[in-house]
């Protein structure tokens, strides 16, 4: 799994020499903090007020409703530029968060209204990460790409820690209204900073193609005929379908019913997963370990499913935090190389569209969540983990075998050192 070659010019600090990135980085950080706080706040609110695990997983699924539209967002961004799309969507986040704050203040907030607002946000939220990655790829020199991706991943994981802890702590001390005032403020800060991001000129191919539909068709054709991209997409869909549900949508259920803790304990569990991811991102960004990207992605995926199964058998809060930290570590060892593999295998003119295609894999998460709700209620949490983990391990092996020349061969471009 190691590689002795040393990639040139991979100093992550160089990214801050680019003005656009100096604005984008804190804007993305504020957005990530708000996302994480919002997920914890509303997930706990729905579970506490409705007592329904099914409603909880419906809420989790609605957050990814727009993943099917991500390729369309990619086409629009390639044609119109990314700055306008970035600050426009973040203005919408701020307005909707302000609406939830007002509903809470006037004691008019209900689980049903939360689900409606979550559906609206869910139409555009999945494309936020696509816009971040594509914007980094198009505004920074190619030599700085991996360093910038490492920074982006580290800030995302640190935001998960801060969001999980702050979200739970603020609502416990100040209540829902004050907590959502903080969320709204973070979105406003993100909107303001996003205005400083440099405009990206539309792709030269945008004017050559006759219609956006042809742009979209070309993206599907491009990915379909690249085994590296197809294999990476398969891994992304698989971990969203069978691994992420236990660290995201089902975590409030585990906190309340398995670990018998409150929202503060839930925050610590979520922060543990994120802390593991942060440690892995720091490890990858240090460039001290020359790992073959695609092989690392496959092995980390298998380890993630195994740790999900161990977590299901854990009832002690501190042991659960440790297992989640390890799961977060291998999660980052899977997802960061996955992004690197896809960006390296993609021509620059297709970055927006291919990253939009990549976000389609997120659709695995709502499917996995919706399937897990009835399973947990009928066969129990542990048995559900058994089913998901066993399927995950089997399908990971199948992916590695089917695309072995593209993903496992040490001479493949997918296995260039990280």
Please annotate each region the language model reported:
Residues 57-59, 72, 79, 83-95, ...:
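C-terminal transmembrane bundle of multi-pass solute transporters/carriers
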Residues 106, 110-113, 141, 199-203, ...:
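Juxtamembrane transmembrane-helix termini
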Residues 47-57, 98-123, 143, 147, ...:
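Membrane-interface helix-capping segments at transmembrane helix termini in multi-pass transporters
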Residues 2-9, 195-221, 409-416:
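Flexible cytoplasmic inter-helical loops of multi-pass small-molecule transporters
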